[in-house]
């Protein structure tokens, strides 16, 4: 039984000593462990089993102390390597001015290295490794100073570009608002001018009718006064000539009545002729205004979709020349002024993009609606 125990003890000692044989093996404890192992083997061979057991236990104790020593030294080396890496990274970060560019990360790393150094001095190697790892983790985002400067310059350029683009958008919005305001003001002025013209025309028509009525009443009054004067003169002449001849008086009275009837008939004929002429003029104007609708043709378009220049030679001149537009190429400027905010360059009427929808303003009060259809026959706008 003692032989078996002694054998197992020797195997255990040899196992412990071989576990850390790679490094730090030649230390005070390992040397004593090996010495007692040899003594145990000799005592065992000599049959001194109790002595061999005692030596083997001493060898095992020193082997355990050697293993703990090796473990401490390995932990110390690991902590030392970790702290050296952290200090090296910290020194590099300082050269890159991390204290200015990454103040928070730099401060955290410095405090961690300081704490790690204290832990290392107190042989708390695990704590030292943790502190070193914390410092390295804090400094991992630190970049070289030239890269930081380049990034700052790029960020500044991007911010300036964004500011310029924002200013351009704001200016474009203001310009658009100004154009829309000007267009609304122009439309309001045009509407007011049309309303004023309509009122003036109505006033003129009313004045003309009143003048015609007054002239008619004056003519009727003059005719009545003349008839009365003629009648009085004839009656006076008849009274004076009563003695001369009753027959002549009767003839004169008949002639006076006939003259009065003829005058009344003439005035009535003139009034009837004036009335018919006014009715015919009104009918003629109504017929002219209804020409665009009563012939079964579509109302003139209010919009025009631009085709291509290369194939269709589309431009303001040719579009204005279209019978359904203005039937007059010289009206191209009217079309341009109404649509210059839709072309790439508002001050360049020669550049009109295909697919652009142009507005066709009315130039004579003609009715317009819908998009121009090249397959529909329109009543051409009469030329002046």
Swiss-Prot record:
Chain intervals for the UniProt region annotation (Disordered): 163-292
Bilayer disposition of the protein: Peripheral membrane protein
Principal cellular location given in the protein's record: membrane
Start-end of each Sequence repeat: 151-155, 156-160, 161-165, 166-170, 171-175, 176-180, 181-185, 186-190, 191-195, 196-200, 201-205, 206-210, 211-215, 216-220, 221-225, 226-230, 231-235, 236-243, 245-252, 254-261, 263-270, 272-279, 281-288
UniProt keywords, alphabetically: Cell outer membrane, Membrane, Repeat, Signal
Membrane as UniProt keyword: yes
Family: To T.pallidum TmpB.
Coiled coil: none
Function statement: Tmp may serve as a porin or transport protein for large molecules.
Keyword Membrane recorded: yes
Sequence segments annotated as region (17 X 5 AA tandem repeats of K-A-A-[AKR]-[ED]): 151-235
Region (6 X 8 AA tandem repeats of [EA]-A-A-R-X-A-A-E): 236-288
Protein name (Swiss-Prot/TrEMBL): Treponemal membrane protein B
Subcellular location: Cell outer membrane
